[in-house]
Amino acid sequence: WEELARLSPEEIRKQGLFPGGFLPLPHPNHAEGGMVFPKFLIDEIKRQESRDLTRFDLDYDLPDHFLPEFPAPMFLTTRPDLGDVSKGKLVTIDNYFELFNGILNPKQLEGLRLLLTAFPQQQFNLTDDRRSEHPSRGVACFDCHANGHTNAATHLAGDVRPQPFRHRIDTPTLRGVNIQRLFGSQRALKTVEDFTEFEQRAAYFDGDPVIATKKGVNVLERGSQVHFMGEFQALLDFPPAPKLDVEGRLDPGKASEQELRGEKLFYGKAACAGCHAPPYFTDNLMHNLKVERFYDPKLVNGVMASADGPIKTFPLRGIKDSPPYLHDDRLLTLED
């Protein structure tokens, strides 16, 4: 790495030295795309709801040990005293009322119900143009954002054509959306309500409103339904971090020597804090890292490895709980 760091981007590109594992990661089948779920999520949804998210044409591609904890704990900004309000369960349409009645107000409870309700989607719907063996009620928001977090389910971003230029999507956690001001890795929608409405009107159907109408798009009512869903999402808190003080810095009395060295690098030589500013480690902006400086454009398993454009600065608070990393899952570990 030190040898590479001494070379210019032009030298690395001309000599073909950019590590292949750091190129954009393709979808499990990039030509086909669409939502694909880890098997552990498929099995649990089938057990609780008798709804099958299996695709007949392809399977999820990353090994379970690279994926987030499942089911993930759920923390609320309004009730930090309760700890994990999911009680170790996957929250679904079948158990949400039992778990949250008396904790949420009626508006928030209705928002959670909508986030857990399956609505028609491109690959999972009731028409014969689908990728499930049997007609499907569809996909819920929390099928990807399980327990308000992420299970690393993937899809292709719907905002680019042709197909090779579409990015694989890393499902981001919904923890801490209350401190964020941009939503979507590149579309830069300005509120979580905008993104909630956009997902079902457009992203659920690859940005094609004609197909959306054919397959039964669920048009959410902005003044109540979208508002309720957004309010619940804004309650989802980051997990506890007992070694950090209120300003987001390590408490020297609790942190290890190695962690303190890491913090020194974070604010110093590695220059991470220039974009990932404490206490939540985001500047709420977008940046173009121009990684394409280091390699020539090439087709890799169906995805065109070329310029990515500006990408949102995602918060690093709680980052250990949401592997894999970067906007397209190309980095499987924090070390990567």
Predicted regions and their residues:
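Periplasmic c-type cytochrome electron-transfer domains
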Residues: W1-D336
